[in-house]
């Protein structure tokens, strides 16, 4: 409907993390409207991981009179830079490949979480229950599966690329600086133009 409203017949689709699952479904259901597909950091979980993530990763949160939701949102964002998954706070799950961003950056992400506080969990739950192993082989459009070297979901790249016919894969550099972001943009542009 969005594409129809904007009078866009077809276009390239990009989806990152949860959005990668959404973009893959658009490509499956409307291949005539998707020129090429880019999946950035698609999560590919085992059944055991899915169950654990559904139970712990994205709890339903509501504002309360003491503002505990504000502290929760800060910790939810901050802890993702320290652990993966963020709810497993052990040395085994510590993310050594990333450094803690400045508080101003964390604050921007927290504000985004707060905008969708009462519904944010629905997108995560949809991604965690997505039947990706069954659905991804149905993608017929040319697809690039990628992730940044510091992305905790990068293990999904190989798994997704194996399932999707007509796919290529690659890894982007660390996105924490402008050079890394520029390289990522160039890699995606080259795929889309190729």
List PLM regions with ranges.
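Catalytic active-site module of serine/aspartate enzymes centered on a nucleophile-bearing elbow/loop
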Residues: 166-194
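Acidic catalytic loop of the alpha/beta-hydrolase fold
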Residues: 149-154
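Short beta-strand immediately N-terminal to the catalytic nucleophile in serine-hydrolase-like folds
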Residues: 13-15, 40
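Gly/Ala-rich beta-loop-alpha elbow adjacent to hydrolase catalytic centers
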Residues: 15-19, 23
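Short beta-strand/loop motif that positions the catalytic acidic residue
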Residues: 139, 145-147
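Conserved acidic catalytic loop of the alpha/beta-hydrolase fold
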Residues: 1-11
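Hydrophobic, aromatic-rich cap/lid helix
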Residues: 99-132
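Flexible "cap/lid" loop of the alpha/beta hydrolase fold
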Residues: 28, 35-70
